[in-house]
Amino acid sequence: MANIAERNNSGQYYVNTRLGVAKTKKEEDFPEFVEGSEVHKLLTDLIEVNAKGFRGVVVTALTGLHLNEHYDPLNDFYGCNPRSIFEGGIWYALQENGVPCGKSDPLNVAKNANQLNEDWAQGRRPQSAATAVVRYLRLVIEAKRNKRARLIDYFFFRLWKFSQTISDFRLAEIKSSDYSRQTQGNKLVDFTLKYPESGNLPQYLIAQLLSGLFRTSKIDVVGGDESVFGTNTTSKKPADIWLEIDGNLINLYEVTVKPISLKRLDDSLDALHSTGHLNYPITFICRIDLDVKDLNISNGSLYYKKKKFDFVDYKYFCLSVFSLLSDDEFSIVLKNVASFVKDKNISIKTKSGWNEFFEGES
Protein backbone atom coordinates (compact mmCIF):
# COMPACT_ATOMS: atom_id res chain seq x y z
CA MET A 1 0.00 0.00 0.00
CA ALA A 2 2.87 2.35 0.83
CA ASN A 3 4.35 1.80 -2.65
CA ILE A 4 1.01 2.67 -4.27
CA ALA A 5 0.69 5.86 -2.23
CA GLU A 6 4.29 6.79 -3.01
CA ARG A 7 3.75 6.23 -6.74
CA ASN A 8 0.54 8.28 -6.73
CA ASN A 9 2.26 11.10 -4.85
CA SER A 10 5.09 11.00 -7.39
CA GLY A 11 2.53 11.26 -10.19
CA GLN A 12 0.87 14.22 -8.50
CA TYR A 13 4.22 15.93 -7.99
CA TYR A 14 5.19 15.34 -11.62
CA VAL A 15 2.02 16.93 -13.01
CA ASN A 16 2.26 19.84 -10.56
CA THR A 17 5.86 20.41 -11.62
CA ARG A 18 5.12 20.27 -15.34
CA LEU A 19 2.20 22.69 -14.97
CA GLY A 20 4.38 24.94 -12.83
CA VAL A 21 6.91 25.11 -15.66
CA ALA A 22 4.10 25.67 -18.18
CA LYS A 23 2.96 28.78 -16.30
CA THR A 24 6.34 30.41 -16.98
CA LYS A 25 6.21 29.81 -20.74
CA LYS A 26 4.88 31.71 -23.74
CA GLU A 27 3.96 30.56 -27.23
CA GLU A 28 7.21 32.08 -28.54
CA ASP A 29 9.16 29.65 -26.37
CA PHE A 30 8.09 26.86 -28.74
CA PRO A 31 9.03 28.11 -32.23
CA GLU A 32 9.07 24.57 -33.64
CA PHE A 33 5.37 24.14 -32.83
CA VAL A 34 3.90 27.20 -34.54
CA GLU A 35 0.26 27.29 -35.58
CA GLY A 36 -0.19 25.02 -38.58
CA SER A 37 2.49 22.57 -37.50
CA GLU A 38 1.55 18.93 -36.95
CA VAL A 39 2.04 19.03 -33.19
CA HIS A 40 0.10 22.28 -32.79
CA LYS A 41 -2.86 20.80 -34.64
CA LEU A 42 -2.72 17.50 -32.73
CA LEU A 43 -2.79 19.26 -29.37
CA THR A 44 -5.60 21.53 -30.51
CA ASP A 45 -7.65 18.48 -31.48
CA LEU A 46 -7.11 16.61 -28.21
CA ILE A 47 -7.06 19.48 -25.70
CA GLU A 48 -9.58 22.01 -26.99
CA VAL A 49 -12.58 19.68 -26.99
CA ASN A 50 -15.57 19.33 -24.67
CA ALA A 51 -14.66 15.74 -23.81
CA LYS A 52 -12.21 15.89 -20.89
CA GLY A 53 -11.14 12.26 -21.13
CA PHE A 54 -8.68 12.63 -23.99
CA ARG A 55 -6.63 15.15 -22.02
CA GLY A 56 -6.73 12.74 -19.10
CA VAL A 57 -5.46 9.84 -21.20
CA VAL A 58 -2.42 11.82 -22.35
CA VAL A 59 -1.62 13.21 -18.89
CA THR A 60 -1.84 9.67 -17.49
CA ALA A 61 0.34 8.24 -20.27
CA LEU A 62 3.01 10.92 -19.80
CA THR A 63 2.95 10.41 -16.04
CA GLY A 64 3.28 6.66 -16.54
CA LEU A 65 6.32 7.24 -18.76
CA HIS A 66 7.86 9.45 -16.10
CA LEU A 67 7.34 6.83 -13.40
CA ASN A 68 8.60 3.96 -15.58
CA GLU A 69 10.73 4.63 -18.66
CA HIS A 70 9.86 1.18 -20.04
CA TYR A 71 6.11 1.83 -19.92
CA ASP A 72 4.42 1.64 -23.34
CA PRO A 73 1.08 3.52 -23.22
CA LEU A 74 0.16 2.69 -26.81
CA ASN A 75 0.41 -1.08 -26.39
CA ASP A 76 -0.13 -1.50 -22.65
CA PHE A 77 -2.06 1.53 -21.43
CA TYR A 78 -3.28 -0.20 -18.27
CA GLY A 79 0.29 -1.21 -17.41
CA CYS A 80 0.68 1.97 -15.34
CA ASN A 81 -2.44 1.31 -13.22
CA PRO A 82 -4.17 4.39 -14.66
CA ARG A 83 -7.10 4.42 -12.22
CA SER A 84 -4.81 4.53 -9.23
CA ILE A 85 -2.36 7.16 -10.46
CA PHE A 86 -5.08 9.37 -11.94
CA GLU A 87 -7.64 9.26 -9.13
CA GLY A 88 -5.00 9.08 -6.39
CA GLY A 89 -2.53 11.61 -7.73
CA ILE A 90 -2.98 13.29 -11.11
CA TRP A 91 -6.56 14.41 -10.40
CA TYR A 92 -5.43 16.41 -7.37
CA ALA A 93 -2.70 18.16 -9.35
CA LEU A 94 -5.15 19.11 -12.11
CA GLN A 95 -7.65 20.39 -9.54
CA GLU A 96 -4.99 22.45 -7.76
CA ASN A 97 -4.05 24.10 -11.05
CA GLY A 98 -7.57 24.74 -12.29
CA VAL A 99 -7.41 22.29 -15.20
CA PRO A 100 -10.86 20.89 -16.17
CA CYS A 101 -11.10 17.18 -15.43
CA GLY A 102 -13.42 14.45 -14.23
CA LYS A 103 -12.71 11.92 -11.51
CA SER A 104 -11.93 9.03 -13.88
CA ASP A 105 -11.19 10.72 -17.22
CA PRO A 106 -8.73 8.24 -18.76
CA LEU A 107 -10.82 5.20 -17.89
CA ASN A 108 -13.99 6.77 -19.28
CA VAL A 109 -12.25 7.17 -22.64
CA ALA A 110 -9.95 4.13 -22.75
CA LYS A 111 -12.87 1.78 -21.95
CA ASN A 112 -10.60 -1.14 -20.94
CA ALA A 113 -8.70 -0.97 -24.24
CA ASN A 114 -5.06 -1.81 -23.58
CA GLN A 115 -3.97 -0.72 -27.06
CA LEU A 116 -4.41 2.90 -28.07
CA ASN A 117 -4.30 2.81 -31.86
CA GLU A 118 -6.32 3.82 -34.91
CA ASP A 119 -8.82 0.99 -34.35
CA TRP A 120 -9.44 2.24 -30.81
CA ALA A 121 -9.76 5.81 -32.06
CA GLN A 122 -12.51 4.86 -34.51
CA GLY A 123 -14.80 3.92 -31.64
CA ARG A 124 -14.37 7.17 -29.72
CA ARG A 125 -16.17 10.49 -30.06
CA PRO A 126 -14.90 12.82 -31.26
CA GLN A 127 -12.70 10.58 -33.36
CA SER A 128 -10.39 13.48 -34.22
CA ALA A 129 -9.46 13.84 -30.55
CA ALA A 130 -8.82 10.11 -30.12
CA THR A 131 -6.70 10.02 -33.28
CA ALA A 132 -4.73 13.00 -32.00
CA VAL A 133 -4.05 11.13 -28.74
CA VAL A 134 -2.59 8.17 -30.65
CA ARG A 135 -0.50 10.29 -33.01
CA TYR A 136 0.83 12.60 -30.31
CA LEU A 137 1.82 9.74 -27.97
CA ARG A 138 3.47 7.99 -30.90
CA LEU A 139 5.58 11.11 -31.54
CA VAL A 140 6.54 11.24 -27.85
CA ILE A 141 7.55 7.58 -27.68
CA GLU A 142 9.58 7.70 -30.90
CA ALA A 143 11.35 10.97 -30.05
CA LYS A 144 14.90 11.28 -28.74
CA ARG A 145 15.33 12.57 -25.19
CA ASN A 146 15.51 16.32 -25.94
CA LYS A 147 12.70 16.27 -28.51
CA ARG A 148 10.55 14.22 -26.14
CA ALA A 149 11.04 16.79 -23.39
CA ARG A 150 9.98 19.57 -25.77
CA LEU A 151 6.87 17.67 -26.85
CA ILE A 152 5.89 17.09 -23.23
CA ASP A 153 6.58 20.67 -22.16
CA TYR A 154 4.48 21.95 -25.05
CA PHE A 155 1.58 19.65 -24.14
CA PHE A 156 1.47 20.97 -20.58
CA PHE A 157 1.82 24.54 -21.83
CA ARG A 158 -1.18 24.08 -24.13
CA LEU A 159 -3.11 22.37 -21.32
CA TRP A 160 -2.44 25.28 -18.98
CA LYS A 161 -3.27 27.82 -21.69
CA PHE A 162 -6.59 26.07 -22.35
CA SER A 163 -7.48 26.08 -18.65
CA GLN A 164 -6.83 29.84 -18.56
CA THR A 165 -9.18 30.36 -21.50
CA ILE A 166 -11.93 28.69 -19.49
CA SER A 167 -11.22 30.47 -16.20
CA ASP A 168 -11.10 33.86 -17.97
CA PHE A 169 -14.41 33.30 -19.78
CA ARG A 170 -16.91 36.07 -19.02
CA LEU A 171 -20.36 34.71 -18.29
CA ALA A 172 -23.37 36.97 -18.84
CA GLU A 173 -25.16 37.99 -15.64
CA ILE A 174 -28.94 37.99 -15.32
CA LYS A 175 -31.18 39.76 -12.85
CA SER A 176 -34.34 37.91 -11.95
CA SER A 177 -36.30 41.07 -11.08
CA ASP A 178 -36.05 42.55 -14.56
CA TYR A 179 -37.99 39.91 -16.50
CA SER A 180 -41.13 37.78 -16.27
CA ARG A 181 -40.69 34.64 -14.17
CA GLN A 182 -41.98 32.41 -16.97
CA THR A 183 -39.92 34.23 -19.61
CA GLN A 184 -36.71 33.62 -17.72
CA GLY A 185 -37.81 30.14 -16.72
CA ASN A 186 -38.45 29.21 -20.35
CA LYS A 187 -35.05 30.54 -21.40
CA LEU A 188 -33.27 28.69 -18.60
CA VAL A 189 -35.01 25.41 -19.41
CA ASP A 190 -34.36 25.80 -23.14
CA PHE A 191 -30.70 26.52 -22.38
CA THR A 192 -30.35 23.29 -20.37
CA LEU A 193 -32.01 21.33 -23.17
CA LYS A 194 -29.79 22.76 -25.89
CA TYR A 195 -26.63 22.48 -23.76
CA PRO A 196 -27.31 19.61 -21.35
CA GLU A 197 -23.61 19.03 -20.56
CA SER A 198 -24.03 15.23 -20.66
CA GLY A 199 -27.24 15.53 -18.66
CA ASN A 200 -25.60 17.31 -15.73
CA LEU A 201 -27.35 20.65 -16.26
CA PRO A 202 -30.96 19.37 -16.37
CA GLN A 203 -30.26 17.25 -13.31
CA TYR A 204 -28.74 20.19 -11.46
CA LEU A 205 -31.62 22.51 -12.35
CA ILE A 206 -34.18 20.01 -11.04
CA ALA A 207 -32.21 19.64 -7.80
CA GLN A 208 -32.06 23.42 -7.39
CA LEU A 209 -35.77 23.84 -8.05
CA LEU A 210 -36.68 21.17 -5.51
CA SER A 211 -34.26 22.69 -3.00
CA GLY A 212 -35.86 26.09 -3.45
CA LEU A 213 -39.34 24.65 -3.12
CA PHE A 214 -38.61 22.80 0.12
CA ARG A 215 -35.92 24.99 1.70
CA THR A 216 -38.10 26.15 4.60
CA SER A 217 -39.71 22.73 5.15
CA LYS A 218 -38.51 19.55 6.85
CA ILE A 219 -37.88 17.96 3.46
CA ASP A 220 -34.26 17.57 2.36
CA VAL A 221 -33.24 17.29 -1.31
CA VAL A 222 -30.39 14.82 -1.89
CA GLY A 223 -28.29 14.39 -5.06
CA GLY A 224 -28.21 16.22 -8.34
CA ASP A 225 -24.90 18.05 -8.17
CA GLU A 226 -22.09 15.50 -7.95
CA SER A 227 -20.83 14.22 -11.28
CA VAL A 228 -19.68 17.34 -13.10
CA PHE A 229 -17.32 18.35 -10.30
CA GLY A 230 -15.61 14.99 -10.16
CA THR A 231 -16.95 14.18 -6.70
CA ASN A 232 -19.04 11.22 -7.71
CA THR A 233 -18.25 7.95 -5.97
CA THR A 234 -18.69 4.36 -6.97
CA SER A 235 -21.34 3.83 -4.29
CA LYS A 236 -24.75 2.93 -5.65
CA LYS A 237 -27.49 5.56 -5.48
CA PRO A 238 -31.19 4.71 -5.66
CA ALA A 239 -31.81 7.54 -8.17
CA ASP A 240 -30.41 10.84 -9.43
CA ILE A 241 -32.29 12.87 -6.81
CA TRP A 242 -34.49 11.97 -3.86
CA LEU A 243 -36.40 13.62 -1.02
CA GLU A 244 -35.99 12.77 2.66
CA ILE A 245 -37.69 13.72 5.93
CA ASP A 246 -35.50 13.22 9.00
CA GLY A 247 -33.28 10.91 6.95
CA ASN A 248 -36.18 8.80 5.71
CA LEU A 249 -36.57 8.65 1.94
CA ILE A 250 -40.00 9.56 0.52
CA ASN A 251 -39.69 10.18 -3.25
CA LEU A 252 -37.15 9.36 -5.97
CA TYR A 253 -36.46 11.11 -9.27
CA GLU A 254 -34.51 10.18 -12.38
CA VAL A 255 -33.70 13.11 -14.67
CA THR A 256 -32.83 12.48 -18.31
CA VAL A 257 -33.02 14.22 -21.66
CA LYS A 258 -32.29 11.07 -23.65
CA PRO A 259 -34.68 8.39 -24.95
CA ILE A 260 -35.64 5.97 -22.18
CA SER A 261 -35.33 2.28 -23.06
CA LEU A 262 -36.39 -0.82 -21.16
CA LYS A 263 -32.70 -1.29 -20.38
CA ARG A 264 -32.78 2.10 -18.65
CA LEU A 265 -35.72 0.91 -16.55
CA ASP A 266 -33.83 -2.29 -15.75
CA ASP A 267 -30.89 -0.20 -14.55
CA SER A 268 -33.25 1.76 -12.34
CA LEU A 269 -34.73 -1.44 -10.92
CA ASP A 270 -31.24 -2.73 -10.17
CA ALA A 271 -30.36 0.48 -8.31
CA LEU A 272 -33.61 0.42 -6.35
CA HIS A 273 -33.19 -3.23 -5.46
CA SER A 274 -29.52 -2.97 -4.44
CA THR A 275 -30.20 0.03 -2.20
CA GLY A 276 -33.35 -1.41 -0.65
CA HIS A 277 -35.74 1.17 -2.13
CA LEU A 278 -37.77 -0.95 -4.51
CA ASN A 279 -41.09 -0.05 -2.86
CA TYR A 280 -40.61 3.71 -3.00
CA PRO A 281 -42.28 5.87 -5.68
CA ILE A 282 -40.02 6.89 -8.55
CA THR A 283 -40.63 9.48 -11.26
CA PHE A 284 -38.71 10.00 -14.49
CA ILE A 285 -38.47 13.70 -15.37
CA CYS A 286 -37.86 13.70 -19.12
CA ARG A 287 -38.95 15.08 -22.49
CA ILE A 288 -42.31 13.37 -22.80
CA ASP A 289 -42.59 14.06 -26.54
CA LEU A 290 -39.17 12.54 -27.31
CA ASP A 291 -37.94 10.24 -24.57
CA VAL A 292 -40.76 7.75 -23.98
CA LYS A 293 -41.70 6.84 -27.55
CA ASP A 294 -40.51 3.26 -27.09
CA LEU A 295 -42.47 2.76 -23.86
CA ASN A 296 -46.14 1.86 -23.61
CA ILE A 297 -47.05 4.63 -21.18
CA SER A 298 -50.65 5.20 -20.12
CA ASN A 299 -51.71 8.34 -18.25
CA GLY A 300 -48.14 9.14 -17.33
CA SER A 301 -47.34 5.72 -15.87
CA LEU A 302 -45.93 2.35 -16.82
CA TYR A 303 -45.94 -0.94 -14.91
CA TYR A 304 -42.76 -2.82 -15.69
CA LYS A 305 -41.67 -5.99 -13.91
CA LYS A 306 -44.22 -5.33 -11.15
CA LYS A 307 -42.89 -1.81 -10.54
CA LYS A 308 -44.78 1.40 -11.32
CA PHE A 309 -42.76 4.13 -13.02
CA ASP A 310 -44.22 7.63 -13.36
CA PHE A 311 -43.19 10.10 -16.07
CA VAL A 312 -43.51 13.89 -16.16
CA ASP A 313 -42.33 16.41 -18.73
CA TYR A 314 -39.07 18.16 -17.86
CA LYS A 315 -40.02 21.59 -19.18
CA TYR A 316 -43.52 21.60 -17.69
CA PHE A 317 -42.16 20.42 -14.35
CA CYS A 318 -39.55 23.20 -14.25
CA LEU A 319 -41.96 25.96 -15.26
CA SER A 320 -44.53 24.81 -12.71
CA VAL A 321 -41.99 24.90 -9.89
CA PHE A 322 -40.71 28.30 -11.05
CA SER A 323 -44.24 29.64 -10.53
CA LEU A 324 -44.26 28.33 -6.94
CA LEU A 325 -40.97 29.85 -5.81
CA SER A 326 -40.66 33.12 -3.94
CA ASP A 327 -38.69 35.92 -5.58
CA ASP A 328 -35.74 35.19 -3.30
CA GLU A 329 -35.76 31.48 -4.09
CA PHE A 330 -36.08 32.19 -7.80
CA SER A 331 -33.02 34.45 -7.60
CA ILE A 332 -31.09 31.76 -5.71
CA VAL A 333 -31.86 29.19 -8.42
CA LEU A 334 -30.63 31.56 -11.16
CA LYS A 335 -27.50 32.41 -9.19
CA ASN A 336 -26.67 28.76 -8.44
CA VAL A 337 -27.18 27.60 -12.02
CA ALA A 338 -24.98 30.46 -13.26
CA SER A 339 -22.27 29.42 -10.77
CA PHE A 340 -22.59 25.84 -11.96
CA VAL A 341 -22.08 26.92 -15.58
CA LYS A 342 -19.12 29.10 -14.59
CA ASP A 343 -17.26 26.16 -13.06
CA LYS A 344 -14.03 25.21 -14.85
CA ASN A 345 -15.33 21.71 -15.57
CA ILE A 346 -18.18 23.05 -17.71
CA SER A 347 -17.25 23.26 -21.40
CA ILE A 348 -16.62 26.47 -23.33
CA LYS A 349 -19.43 25.39 -25.67
CA THR A 350 -21.93 25.42 -22.80
CA LYS A 351 -20.59 28.69 -21.38
CA SER A 352 -20.96 30.28 -24.82
CA GLY A 353 -24.46 28.83 -24.96
CA TRP A 354 -25.31 30.60 -21.71
CA ASN A 355 -24.26 33.91 -23.24
CA GLU A 356 -26.25 33.06 -26.36
CA PHE A 357 -29.39 32.88 -24.20
CA PHE A 358 -28.68 35.58 -21.60
CA GLU A 359 -26.32 38.19 -23.12
CA GLY A 360 -27.84 41.63 -22.76
CA GLU A 361 -29.78 40.86 -19.59
CA SER A 362 -27.11 42.20 -17.25
Pin down the residues of each PLM region.
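Short, mixed-charge, low-aromatic patches
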Residues: Y14-N16, G88-Y92, L107-A113, L159-D168, ...
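Interdomain/boundary linker segments immediately adjacent to catalytic/signaling cores
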Residues: A2-G53, R135-Y204
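"Short basic amphipathic alpha-helical interaction patches in structured regions
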Residues: F77-N81, D153-Y154, S268-L269
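Short, charged/polar micro-motifs that form catalytic or ligand-binding hotspots
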Residues: D119-P126, T192-N200, K258
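Catalytic core segments in nucleotide and nucleic-acid processing enzymes
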Residues: Y204-S362
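A diffuse structural propensity rather than consistent per-protein peaks
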Residues: N81, S180-R181, S261-K263
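Terminal, charged accessory segments of proteins
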Residues: M1-R138
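A general boundary/transition motif marking the beginning of the first structured unit of a protein
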Residues: A121-R124, A143, S176, S198, ...
